[in-house]
Amino acid sequence: DDDFSKAGSIAELTDWNIYSPLWAPVTLDGKWLRLQDKDPFDYAKVERKIPASKELKISFDLQAGQNDKGTLQIDFLDENSIACSRLELTPDGVFRAKGGSRFGNLMKYEPGKNYHVEAILSVTDRNIQVFVDGKRVGLRMFYAPVPAIERIAFRTGVPRTFPTVDTPADQTYDLPNAGDQEPLAEYRIANVKTSSVDKDATAAVLKYADFSHYADYFNGMEDENIAQAIPNAKASEWMEENIPLFECPQ
């Protein structure tokens, strides 16, 4: 679970891979992780590594600053960053899902409005169910088979596939309109939560700070009358550095 309001700076989001170019910056804005983009040749991107899951539930809050420009793609990927499914906010104001070689429209979206998005992905059934504000808006097949889902990426543009292995090494031309900017597009995400419903689900790593008060309570129950290698006053600090906490699937 990611609560961005608890982060003091973008550097504290150590569980995320963040790609933040000058004209497509990623910043924190209160509880929101904000992705902006005015670069016609690049994009902002954030990616979260999660425990490998064959049956995955994910939820997040989503807000678009506009619905007449910009693109936000949400990819669900395996360990090799191969995407099996994609959700997308288009510059035409449509929230859609990719299935096979085609997209299926889910709903229209409005600028500045908060949406609570939930998705259930099944590697076994090769499909994704999408819910917005508690209402099911679509079911789409995966467009690529994957053994498990291990990453979630939010990106303000389409994936780059150029250059290829056959692209000439020497280029004697500039890209058209190099140096120009596009109108600014902005997207915000918050409260990203994932859970695996696999029968043999991989346990999620928990944040020690959420449980440190238990260690402090037990360490303070009795006076420390025997000197230890790690005194009670330092026990919680040592545990945070050396003992990871895991959520045990039921």
Which residues make up each language-model segment?
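Extracellular carbohydrate-recognition regions
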Residues: D1-I18, A190-C248
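Short, aromatic/His-centered strand-loop micro-motif at the edge of beta-sheets
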Residues: R96-E118
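Flexible glycan-contacting loops in extracellular carbohydrate-active proteins
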Residues: R140-R188, A203-V205
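Short strand-turn-strand beta-turns centered on an Asx-Gly dipeptide
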Residues: F131-K135
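Extracellular/lumenal carbohydrate-interaction signature centered on repeated Trp-anchored short motifs
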Residues: E47-I58, L106-K113, P183
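Intrinsic-disorder/low-complexity, polar/charged segments enriched in Ser/Thr/Lys/Arg/Asp/Glu/Gln
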Residues: D1, K45, E55-S59, N114-H116, ...
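Short tryptophan-centered beta-strand motifs in secreted/extracellular beta-sheet-rich domains
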Residues: F60, G112-V123, I128-V130
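Secretory/extracellular carbohydrate-interaction modules
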Residues: D29-A97, H213, N219-I226, N232-Q250
